[in-house]
Amino acid sequence: MYYLLFMLKIRLARFGRKKRPYYKIVVANSSSPRDGKFLEQVGSYDPLLSKDDPLRVCLDIERIRYWTSVGAKPTERVAKFVACL
């Protein structure tokens, strides 16, 4: 298992354009850059949508459970998103 050899993080990767951020929630090596290579996209976050919009945070809970069982640790922000569901 290739991904067991290093520390994994479930974190936000910034996309979009200047002053219009859009984030993908990804599983990546903890030493890779914020917007660098990642193993899998497990959700998305659009901070420009209203707080009650259901599309503001989209998560694939099954895949997040899988990656946490393998040893991936969510960042503080991603942990808040998961706790809200």
From Swiss-Prot:
GO terms for cellular component: cytoplasm; small ribosomal subunit. It holds the Pfam family Ribosomal_S16. It comes from the Bacteria. The keyword Ribosomal protein applies. The keyword Cytoplasm does not apply. One of its GO terms (molecular function) is structural constituent of ribosome. GO terms for biological process: translation. Keywords: Ribonucleoprotein, Ribosomal protein. Belongs to the bacterial ribosomal protein bS16 family. This is Small ribosomal subunit protein bS16. The lineage of its organism: Bacteria, Pseudomonadati, Pseudomonadota, Alphaproteobacteria, Rickettsiales.
